[in-house]
Amino acid sequence: MVALLAVVGIGVAVFVGFNIGGSSTGVAFGPAVGSRLIRKTTAGALFVAFGFLGAWTVGREVITTMSSSIVPAAQFTPLASVAVLFFTGASLLVSNLYGVPASTSMTAVGAIVGLGLASGTLNQALMFVIVSAWIVAPL
């Protein structure tokens, strides 16, 4: 059962990555591609390179928050983790299909909040801080 869940988890992670690429690449590079400053393939290569660099260098604190601060790390069983990934990917897929830009971060946090609500372990004080930052950030 664990091996099957690992295979499903890898498939779901690929599904999420595909949808992150569909969502975030357009937002980040759409104007440059639309104005013909760069080609789509160049945008894709830049997205991969800088996505990896950002994850490796400055993404660690976000990973810590997402993996153990919104809900306790113990809630992330293999099944719960696959479910969170699936709902993140499914939400992004729907927004991609309708051409609506969606924040990957907000979508992933929303899926984790769902886990926290279902398990009764949501860190509400931290969510207040996160939602406040979402409201203030565009200003």
Where are these regions (language model features)?
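Membrane-interface alpha-helices at helix entry/exit sites of multi-pass transporters
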Residues: 37-48, 78-82, 124-129
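Structural signal for the N-terminal portions of transmembrane helices
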Residues: 122-139
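Interfacial segments of multi-pass membrane proteins
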Residues: 31-38, 110-122
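Transmembrane alpha-helix boundary signature
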Residues: 57-68, 97, 101, 122-125
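Hydrophobic alpha-helical transmembrane segments
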Residues: 21-30, 75-86
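Alpha-helical transmembrane segments in multi-pass membrane proteins
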Residues: 9, 13-15, 19, 43-55, ...
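Short, non-helical or kinked segments that cap or interrupt transmembrane helices
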Residues: 21-29, 37, 98-110
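Helix-loop-helix hairpins and the membrane-proximal interhelical loops
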Residues: 1-7, 47, 55-81
